């Protein structure tokens, strides 16, 4: 990522671990989605962005929520209490949530002016990645796992949200190599893109993530985990790869249709 703006660089240094999927995950999803699109669609995308780096654009929503546009903070997640495991439009509070923000930005991509479309395509790429991160559908009382404090490998202080935002992916990079991990994600994303159809309804995707978040193996709902070891990271690595691949394919399919004109 090219950090030409000094303020952007400062924001990234001091807020990195509060980011959704961290900036690596967002850049990965959006750049790989752009690579899956047809040449005409990607050209339309880059024209809207005024850039050929969709990944950098998709990190932007996490930067602006820190200072410039704090009101967008609630747009990155949906919280739902334990026991309410099917997320519906009624789950979204008055201040907004990721579903309402996604729908608003999709409308702006279709009907907005040039500046609104530029923001919208960046928000949409970011939101689709967030939707596929299970802890973005977590509980309000612990802020989606941010207040579920734990240790990583017995010594490093962390929290449940950070484990799923980046620690699992980082573990995969360290143990398998970034090139191999990216190949697995690419192969799976291509398969999904061949087999999935256009869909602009994010509720099924949200509920996939919620089902993972409250599953027994994740240990977020019951038997809440206090120490995440390498066994946990390895076991859930395949889920992270799958969620990233789905986000890539679904974003590519969505924009193929929305930017086709």
Predicted segment positions?
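N-terminal, motif-rich segments that launch catalysis or mediate targeting to/interaction with membranes
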Residues: 19-127, 134, 139-261
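Sec-dependent signal peptide recognition
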Residues: 2-9
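N-terminal signal peptide c-region/cleavage motif recognized by signal peptidases
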Residues: 15-17
């Amino acid at each position: 990522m090219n950090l030409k703006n000094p303020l952007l660089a400062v924001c990234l240094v001091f807020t990195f671990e509060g980011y959704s999927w961290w900036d690596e995950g967002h850049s990965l999803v959006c750049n790989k989605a752009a690579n899956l699109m047809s040449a005409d669609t990607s050209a339309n995308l880059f024209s809207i962005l005024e850039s050929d780096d969709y990944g950098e654009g998709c990190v932007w929503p996490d930067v602006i929520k820190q200072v410039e546009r704090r009101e967008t903070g609630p747009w990155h997640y949906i919280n739902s209490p334990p026991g309410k495991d099917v997320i519906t439009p009624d789950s979204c509070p008055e201040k907004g949530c990721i579903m309402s923000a996604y729908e608003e930005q999709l409308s702006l991509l279709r009907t907005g002016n040039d500046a609104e479309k530029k923001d919208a395509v960046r928000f949409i790429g970011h939101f689709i990645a967030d939707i596929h991160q299970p802890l973005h559908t977590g509980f309000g009382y612990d802020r989606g796992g941010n207040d579920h404090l734990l240790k990583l490998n017995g010594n490093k202080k962390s929290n449940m949200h950070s484990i799923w935002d980046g620690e699992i992916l980082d573990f995969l990079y360290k143990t398998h190599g970034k090139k191999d991990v990216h190949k697995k994600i690419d192969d799976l994303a291509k398969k999904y893109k061949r087999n999935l159809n256009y869909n602009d309804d994010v509720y099924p995707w949200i509920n996939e993530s919620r089902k993972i978040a409250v599953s027994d193996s994740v240990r977020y709902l019951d038997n809440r985990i206090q120490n995440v070891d390498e066994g946990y990271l390895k076991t859930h690595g395949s889920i992270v790869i799958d969620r990233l691949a789905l986000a890539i394919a679904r974003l590519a399919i969505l924009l193929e249709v929305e930017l086709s004109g």
